[in-house]
Amino acid sequence: MLTGQECLEVSDSRITASTVEMLDCDKEYDIAVIDEAQMVADDDRGHSWTRAILGTLAGEIHICMSPVAKDVVIHLINLCHDEYEIREYERKTALKLEDKPFSFPQDVREGDAFIVFSKKSVLNIAGRLEENGIKPSVIYGSLPPEIRRRQMTLFNEKKTQVVVSTDAIGMGLNLPVRRIVFLEVEKFDGVSRRPLVISEIKQIAGRAGRFGLYDTGYVTALGQKNLNYLKNTLNIPEQDIDIVSLGFPQVLLTMDAPLDAIIKLWHEAEPSAPFRKINVDEILFLYGYAYKERYFIADFDDKYLLYKMITCPIDIKDRELVRQWLRYCMSYTSDISLDKPDKHSKYQGLMKYESYYKKLDLYYQFSVRMGKIVEEDWLENERDKTQAKIMQLLSKSKDEYIIRCRYCGRILPIGNSRNICRDCYSMIRR
């Protein structure tokens, strides 16, 4: 299995499974399977599905998707002048929206998966469940992949009774979930807080009712207002996807112009339907960050090399990580291996170790991109130790993560956005 974070090798294996970003389009396969192809419209990752559909070299390609993506995927296939065959399948377990809204914690049942949309909310709900004697597994985006697998294993083996997750549960996770419970029906999408759209609801709700374990999967929401939103949204016919995300074509790097100018020029040109170009803000942010130190970066004028650097996937909101990335840009020619990440961090507790794990990921990804030798024994040992510490912290009481009124310490209702209870708010307003 190959992802941007790890490479898990099995001797004599004839099958390679990878994230879509890690697909080698220069390698020829006997058969290829591209899953979740409705993601071609995704603003962040969609261009990788577009690249896979247009660029996979295989005698036979199976493209699995939601029906709403069928026409746009056929359009991509026709651009390649390839033949295709359509096969449609029905969901094997029924999916039922419950009539009664969910009450927390009275209605908690074994096999439930609770959906919220931030790490803070995941740990808050997990802490509340523990206070009620219920053991949860937790899943959220910044958890290392091995920790996610271990949390899933705890649930699969019934060592935990429920799961608390972000929408990370919607893709690539196969869990014995009986019921999906939406505790929130709004999410922050990086720009603003907005209601979930029908495709997001269906993607998550579809995790309820594992085939072979349950005949029916159930879906509900916290409170009548949220349940009504689910009912109303699910009754709206889902619109066909009419957008395909398009990534930056590296062939343009041959142009005689600075890299940032080329990227901006490409992005300003209007694409033909159904294509929509990716957002290049993060790439240009990293370019600008590197440009300030360009005299200390070897071969800064090599656009192919620089493009590799600025497209290295990192969380630009984590400034410790960005500083580490810049150090690698400035020092990658000084030795056969990159410097090991700094363990010191401004963060404490769980966030400290999650941040360090991201630094280890950056060490690995930047090394692979720039052809540096990865000190694999050291890296594996550091990852193991960091994962063990994260698991240890997750196994402890999560009382500190429960969101309480900042004045009286009372536990706040789920979804409260003020960090203050109603009584204290009324007193302050007098």
Give residue spans per PLM region.
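Conserved strand-helix element at the start of the C-terminal RecA-like helicase core
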Residues: 62-64, 70, 107-132, 136-140, ...
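Walker B catalytic acidic pair
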Residues: 35-37, 184
